[in-house]
C-alpha cells in the first residue's frame, strides 16, 4: 500500500460550470481520486448561483481534505461579461478554500497547458489527452471542466516546488516580493 504524500484540488472556475478534480501525489506518481462539476442554472439569481458554487466546493474540500489548490485565473478574451462572471465564480470557490486555510496557487490557461502538454498554446483535446495519460485514466474525464480542473491540479505539482525554491531565493538574496512570484519569505513582504 502506498502512502499519499499530498492531496491536491484543481479548480476550473465558471459561473455555469465549475470543474473540480482531486489528484493524489506520492513522489512523482499522480493518481486521480475523484472529479466533478458544480453546475448552476442560468435562471437562478446570481447570488444563489455563487452560493451553490461555494457550498458545493466547501463540501468537496470537507470530503477529500486537500492540502493545497491549483486554480485557473480568469482569462480576459473577447467577452468581458463572461470574464466577470468567471471571476465571481472563482471568488466563491476561493472563499471555500480560504475557510480551510488551504495553500492556493493560481495559473493562467497557458501555464496549465505548458505544464500538462508542454506547449502553452495546446488545444483542449491535447490537454484532455495528456490528463488521461498522466493520471492513467481509462477515458478522458467528462465534462471538459473536470478535465481542466485535473489539469490545474497537475500544474500545481510542477509549479509548487518552483514557487518554494523561488521564495527561498528571494529570502536568501533579500529580494522583495512584488507580487510576481510566490515568495513566502517575510523579508520580502515586510518592505512592500
Cite the ranges covered by each PLM segment.
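Phosphate- and other anionic-substrate recognition elements at nucleic-acid/protein interfaces
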Residues: 1-192
